Amino acid sequence: LQKRTQVFALELNASIRSRLTHSLEVAQNARYIARTILDELKKNDLKTYGLEDMENAFISTSEMTSLIHDIGNPPFGHFAEETINKWLKINILPKLESFKSSTKEIEDLKSILKSDICNYDGNAQAIRIITKLQRLNLSYFQIIAVLKYTRGAFENKPDNSDSLNYLKKKPGFYYSEKDLVEKIQTTLNIKAGHRFPITYIMEAADDISYLTADLEDSVEKGILSLDEVYNIITSECTKQNEEFLLEIINKQYEKAKKNDEPYQFNMFFTFLRVTLVTNFVKHVSDVFIKNHKAIFEGSFNHALLEYDKTSKYYKA
C-alpha cells in the first residue's frame, strides 16, 4: 500500500498520504468508533446486544477490517480502475465474445463473465486478494467484514426502487469468489445483499479520514496556502449558512495563528482534525446505536455519516 496513490501519484514526500498512511488513519478511527459504541452500549448492559465478553473482538475486527479495506486498490487509485476496465473491454472482451459456446450452460457462464470481467473494482479485488491471491487465512467474520458492497461484479446495478440499492451501488466481489461469499453468508446467517455490521464502522472510519486529508496534502505540496484553504472553507460555510463548521474553522485558525510561522500549517490541521474526528465519531456512534437492529440485520441502507441529512454533521 505504501506506493499506491491516495490522491497524488508517485509522491516522494513522506508527509503526503499514500494508501498505507490513509489505511492506518482509518484503522485508528475505527478503533475509536468501536470503543465509543461499546462505551454507550455498556450503559444498557452488553448482554442486551449479545456483545458480552466480545468487546475486544468487536474492536479488533473493526480495526483489522479498516486496516486492509484498501488492499485491493490498484496503483494510481480510481483512475487506474477506469483504465483497467477500459483495457479489458478493448483487449479481453472481444476474445470472450468470439469464444464459441457448445452448450447453453457455457453460454450462460459466458454472459455472466462478460459483465464480471469488465467491472474491475478495488473493493471486489480486496476480497479476491485476501481469499485467493494472498490467502491470508482469515476467519469468516474477518472476510465478510471487508465486503463493503454486497453486489457481485457480474450483477446489474439496482435502481432506486431496490431497498438495498446503496449497499449494492458498486461491485463487492467477483464471480470467482461468489461461492465463497455465499458459503460465508449461509454459515453466518447473513441474507444475500445484506452487509456485516462491523463493515458500517469501517466505512464510517474511512469517510471520517477524508475530512481534512486532501486539503492537508494540498497545502503540504504547496498547491494551496493555509490562508487560501481558510478563505475557501469559510466562504462556502457562509454561502451554505453552515455555522457548526465555520465556528470550528475560525477557532482553530486563530489558535494556529498564535504559533510561530513555521508551525501554523501543522497546528491548524492538527487542531482541526482532532476536533472534527471527535465530533464525527460521536455522531456516527449515535447513528449506529439508534439503528442497531437494522445494522445487525445488515439491511441498513445508508452510510452512517450520511444517514441524517438534517444534522449539522452531514451539512459540514
Task: State what each model feature region is.
Residues L1-R4, N13, L24, Q28-N29, ...:
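Sequence-structural signature of the catalytic-core scaffold of metal-dependent phosphohydrolases
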Residues V7-A9, P75, I295, S299:
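Intrinsic disorder/low-structure terminal segments
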